[in-house]
Structure formats: structure tokens, C-alpha cells
């Protein structure tokens, strides 16, 4: 029974994406004057693997584009073509077009014909120039396709040494045996086919290169499942006799001549990752999300049982209570293990910036050195995909407005090469991402003047950090002219809003003439939260534990009134704004006298304030439920959760609460 090869499309798409990313990184690292042989080989192998897979799935345009690039790379690694910056740029452009072609195939669309013809002509022209010819290589697409098909056949032909190739595939899944037989049949005529429950062996009648076979099969199985042996041609009777007595054997017991060519073909790329690749599998994100949801329900159930067990007599039910404690520990360990599946390294984000910085710095006429720190730091997949756009905007802003032109840096006594640092590290239950440049820094006077002209409430006594945060106001920009890079005043406010929607906040530190650091703090995950539950009248609210500094009983002498009905609480010489939770959410029956309640000191976006509640309940894990998708967006509330007794509690948006409280008071005063 035959299986549709389209079942393996996604495997090819995923691996091709990884190969293209590797190709770009190696191209960026190449020194044209003295290219590293290993890097050139890695780029060549990536192109060769993509070409083989594209041919298998019938992605002709991608196959032909990759084939032309592969030929040029082969000339470069054999020293027949001298690399330079223009050639590297052309290879990078080819990689971009290959990515566009791959994306088109993902969407079941045909790639753009114009870009295909353009890049093929450019590559063929380069090939002619490398051979000392200057005739333009303008070739019609149809003719190009035919030519490449002929070249592909020619390059796979081995010397006619009257030998055939026998392939042995082992450790196969049941549904792979027929599929692989079909695919091998597409490459050559098969004879002496022997199929087992988990193995397949066959002789290929035709001139097919071993590395081309490996390139195709490795999109379905691993390289160490493939082995080859040469079968010397003989009269029919002898050949038949040989086939009959040759048992199907796994690669481990094949004679030395049957040594797996797959290992030779992939040696440079696979050696460092052999252990990782042999112990990893691809799992759809939807399945991981479903598993996380089930673990979330388990946490809720465990919380319900824990609440019930607290009502039991510890003398009569000691063993049950002990077992409940063990269940709680196991549930937490399970939750942490499952959550780690969704964690991805920041390298996924950082890897796209070397190319961006290189291209944009060249466009702006600046020299910039990019340093990446903490690429292995992990973050939840849902957040890592959403952080790309904000970080991209910050990097572009640093390049355009932060780092000066070379002549200005020389005048300021700086190195002409500017420094841009992207870093990531864990801080408690958060991840801290920083974008740092050693450019001109923020101009305090210009920012204040611009803010005043826009009618913003500012004064000369504001700290440098407070002045810096003004650039995140909607429509705010001090750029003297608008460019296609930045300066339109739309972006920094969107960056801040996007970060806040992810449950994080953004801070800025800048010193004029020395540079700027923009810091982003995000929770590691949005699925499960460590929180402190508090009560206001009959309502329960959850405060994110990483925002809680301390709690205390306020005294009358520490409370001080301000204009507009506001009050501040003095805590060890520091005056903190007092936010009364019952007023913000209009909760009836709450304790209105501050001295009768409890104050929780919270910190968000570098600012501290005091939150008045009736009672502290305790600390525990809660499963975050999206409130907006199930109800509607509520100001001051970030999400909801289900408590152990089955009731719903709201999770407070700590960063928005103080501003919401101020807006309500201003509205009351204006009325």
C-alpha cells in the first residue's frame, strides 16, 4: 500500500527553514578574502540537501535556484572562484529568494516567476564571470529548467564500472516501508526488493549518486538508518544466486564496503549534534498546548483537593494529608516539566539580527559591531514569537538614531565602529532582554521641548529615566526628518503596548553622549503564574508574586493627604502612592479605612506603590485563563483563574493599576 509523499511536506519545510537559517549565518560569518573551508562546506551541504528535498517533492523552481547556487559554492570551495563582498551579497539575496519560494510552496502557491528569473540570470552571469567570460547569461525560464534537469542527471552519473548500488534501510516504521520503496523507485529502477517489518533492501539499476539518495531519504528517516554496498555486475544466473544468498541485514553487520555513505555525506553537519538529533522528535505546537491545558486542569483539581484536605482533622486523616502534599509536589514537577517543552532559546530571535544590522548599517553608512549575549536563555514559545517585532524596532531605532556616523564618533573621541549589544538573562521568574548601544544617547532638552510643544505634563525636575520614558508616548518623535528606517513617531508606543500585553514592562536608561539601554522584562510563561491571593470584601484578586515586595499594616501617622484626594504612605522614609483596590473596581462592603486593612507594596516598571486590600489569603500557583477571549477586556485586569473552590478570581494588571487609579481621580476632580 502506497502512502502520499505529501505527508512529509512539513518535515521538509521545517528542515529547509533550519538549513536556510544556517546558510545565512555561515554567509554572514564568512571572510571573503580568506573563507573558512568548513563554513563553505556547511553552506554547500545545506544547499545540496534543500535541492534534493525540493526535487523529491516536485518543487522545481526552488530546486533549480538552489542548483545554480550549489554549483557556484562548489567552485568557491574548490578554489576555482575568488569570493568578494558582492558575491556574498548575491548569495544572501539568493537565500532570501529561496526563503520566499519555500514560503510560497508552504501556502500551496507558485513562487514569483520574475524574482526566479532575475536571480537565476544573476547566478549564471556570476558563473560566466568566474570562468573569465562576460557574455550576459539571459536564459528563458523554460530553457533554464531543461538545462538544469540535464545537469542534474549528468552530475549523478557515476563512472560506468559495471556495478550496481544496493541500499539497506533499517529501523523503519511500518508506514515508511512502502513510502520509501516508492521514493527509491522514483530515483531509479529497483530490483531484488526485499521488505521486512522494519527494513527494506533493494538494488538500484541506474546511475544514482549515494549523496543524492541520502539527501532525499533524510527528510523521512535518519542518516544512520541508511547503508550502501556495491554489487558487482555478473551474468544473470550469478547475480540471481548472489541475491538469493544475501540476507537482509541492518547496517551494523554490513561488510566494510557497505559503510553508510550517509555518515560521510553528513559528517561535517551532524557530528556536533548527533546525540541531540538521535534523541529528539518533532511535535506539533497544538499537541503541546493541549498537554499544557490538561496540566493546568490538573493543577486546578489539585488545588481543590488541597482546599478540602485543609478542612480534615490531621489526627484522623494524617496519611491522606501527607499524600495530598506529595500530590502537590508531583503536580508542580509535572507542570514545570511540561512547561519546559514550550521553552525556546533566545537564539531563535537573536539569529535574525546579524543580517539586519549588517544590511541597515551599510545602508546608513555606519560601522556597527553586534554582540549577542545569552542566546541560550529560554522563553516561552508564544512570547518568543511576539517579542520579535518590538526588538526589531528597537534595534532599527538604535542604528538610525542612537549610533552616530563615523565622522561624528571620531569628533567625540569614540571608535568609528559603534557597538550594539543584545542580551538576555533570567531574573527570578522573569526574563530580562536589553538593547544597548554606545551612541549619542537621548537629548534631554530636546525631548522636554518636544513634550511641552505637544501639551504633555512635564517639568524640569523629572529624572533622566522619567524623561526617557516620554519617547514611548503615542506619536512622540524628536527626529528632524522622517526616513524609511524610523522617525515617524509611530512605533515606540506600540513597542511599549505590545510588551505590556505580554505581561511585561519596558524601562530605559540613557546618558547623553554615552549611549542608551532599553530593558524589557517579561514573564517566562503566560500559562501558569505564581501569585498572592488577596480579598476585598467578598471578592478575591490575584497579584503576580514577582511584583510583590512586602506587606504591612499601615499606621495613621504614616498616611499623608495630597491635592485631588490622593494619599501617600510613608515607608521607611519613602513616600509611596496609595491605591485603594476597592475604589478602582468599585467593590461594595470593603474596608474603607486604610488602618483597618493590609497594604501590599508592589513594584512595576521601576516604580513602587502601595495597594490597600482587606486581607491576605496566601501564595499559590494559578492557571492563567484569557479573560478577553472568554468575556471582554477589563481595564486593570490582565487575566482570570479558577480557584480551588471552583470560583473565578481576577488577576490584577499591576503595571496598569496605578495609572487607572489616577485617571479615575482626575475624572472625579474634573466632574
Swiss-Prot record:
> Where does the record place it?
Cytoplasm
| Highest taxon, organism lineage | Bacteria
Q: Where is this region: Disordered?
A: 256-278
Q: Please give the biological process terms from Gene Ontology that the record holds.
A: chemotaxis
A GO cellular component annotation here is: cytoplasm
Using the record's annotations, give every residue carrying the modification Phosphohistidine: 48
Q: Which SMART domains match?
A: CheW, H-kinase_dim, HATPase_c, HPT
Q: Fill in the subunit field for this protein.
A: Trimer or tetramer.
Q: What is this protein called?
A: Chemotaxis protein CheA
Q: Which organism is it from?
A: Salmonella typhimurium (strain LT2 / SGSC1412 / ATCC 700720)
Its taxonomic path starts at:
Bacteria, Pseudomonadati, Pseudomonadota, Gammaproteobacteria, Enterobacterales
